[in-house]
Every structure is written in structure tokens, then in C-alpha cells.
């Protein structure tokens, strides 16, 4: 496997963990959690690999999402 493929697989697994933990923590459906995550600035930062944020623990990333983008929770 090349490095780009490994990074893509890692990112997909990270997104799954973020969405699952967000749904569990906020007691919302997986669909709602997906909508929140994929409409967040955090998702964009992770996708672009900005600041190495994608290497933080998924639980920390969920806390960052909840603290920095609370307006997304109003949508669910």
C-alpha cells in the first residue's frame, strides 16, 4: 500500500468513529450525526489535512466540534 491510500483508509475510519461517537454522546441518530459532521468546518479541515488535526483522538475531535460549532447541533 502506498502512503496516500493508507491516509485515505485512516481518514475513513476516523470519520466513522467521529460520527458514531457523536451520535452516542448526543443521543442522536447516525444520520443526524453524519449530517452534522459532514456540514462542519472540522470535516473540511480533516479532509484537507489542515494542521495535522486528523491525528487527534476521535473523542477529542468530537469535543472540538461541539465546542467550536454549536450551531450545527441546533439543526438536528
Residue ranges of model-derived segments:
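C-terminal alpha-helical interaction appendages
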Residues: 1-76
Amino acid at each position: 500500500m502506498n502512503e496516500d491510500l493508507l491516509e485515505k483508509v485512516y481518514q475513513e475510519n476516523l470519520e466513522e468513529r467521529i460520527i458514531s461517537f457523536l451520535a452516542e454522546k448526543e443521543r442522536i441518530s447516525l444520520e443526524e450525526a453524519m449530517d452534522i459532521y459532514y456540514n462542519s468546518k472540522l470535516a473540511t479541515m480533516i479532509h484537507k489535512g489542515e494542521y495535522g488535526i486528523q491525528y487527534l483522538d476521535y473523542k477529542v475531535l468530537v469535543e472540538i466540534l461541539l465546542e467550536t460549532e454549536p450551531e450545527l447541533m441546533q439543526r438536528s
